[in-house]
């Protein structure tokens, strides 16, 4: 039996939010929140979905550094964010399907931490569309989805972005018609700059 994609996505969202929150806050509150999201996900689906979602522990290596430009045309270097936990995701600047949902989860997860804990977390999105790389495009996407002042949406030249994709094993494919398919990945980087946890859901199609 096939279930609507919207229902499948809701289940994926719930599990992704759970994982991110538990990683960022190892408290009893976090465990309670984990239980809440898990129960909500169970209510959203009555059969297993076909898409895989998992959080995979990393080997703790230093996250590859990079310098890109944010939605305000300011240069951002990953290594300058040391001292705060980084939630790094790859977002297509033209995407209207899964990417907005990923952004919502990033925002909601951070908001639920409370002001003190949230001040120690930085949300970073790297443009997953090497054909739509202007600052205006990542700014417009951020405005459209209520994220303008909630994260840094980073972009650069196609060559710069391809270098980041390669460093983070992010698969990005552009068809002859311009359709972009990329891994919907989220990475947790600890305050010392080391990779801690990796999440991957279904591929995102713009």
Per-range role (PLM):
Residues 63-64, 86, 183-185:
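Short loop/turn microsegments at loop-to-beta-strand junctions
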Residues 67-68, 188:
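Hydrophobic beta-strand positions
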Residues 1-65:
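N-terminal targeting signals for export/organelle localization
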Residues 76-106:
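Short active-site neighborhood of thiol/selenol oxidoreductases, capturing the structured segment around
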Residues 124, 139-183:
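Short, internal strand/loop/helix patches
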Residues 175-206:
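Thiol-/selenol-based redox modules, centered on thioredoxin-like
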Residues 84-85, 102-125:
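Conserved helix-turn-beta segment immediately C-terminal to the redox Cys motif
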């Amino acid at each position: 039996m096939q279930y609507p994609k919207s229902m499948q996505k809701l289940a994926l969202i719930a599990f992704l939010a759970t994982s991110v929150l538990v990683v960022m806050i190892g408290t009893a509150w976090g465990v309670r929140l984990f239980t809440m999201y898990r129960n909500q996900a169970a209510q959203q689906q009555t059969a297993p979905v076909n898409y895989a979602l998992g959080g995979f522990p990393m080997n703790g290596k230093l996250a590859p550094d990079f310098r890109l430009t944010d939605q305000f045309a300011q240069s951002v270097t990953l290594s300058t964010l040391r001292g705060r936990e980084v939630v790094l995701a790859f977002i297509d600047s033209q995407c209207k399907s899964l990417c907005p949902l990923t952004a919502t989860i990033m925002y909601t997860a951070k908001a639920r931490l409370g002001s003190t804990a949230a001040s120690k977390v930085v949300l970073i999105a790297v443009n997953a569309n090497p054909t739509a790389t202007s600052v205006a495009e990542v700014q417009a996407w951020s405005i459209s989805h209520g994220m303008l002042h909630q994260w840094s949406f980073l972009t650069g030249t196609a060559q710069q972005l391809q270098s980041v994709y390669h460093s983070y094993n992010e698969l990005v494919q552009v068809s002859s018609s311009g359709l972009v398919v990329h891994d919907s990945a989220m990475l947790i980087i600890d305050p010392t700059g080391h990779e801690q946890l990796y999440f991957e859901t279904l591929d995102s199609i713009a």
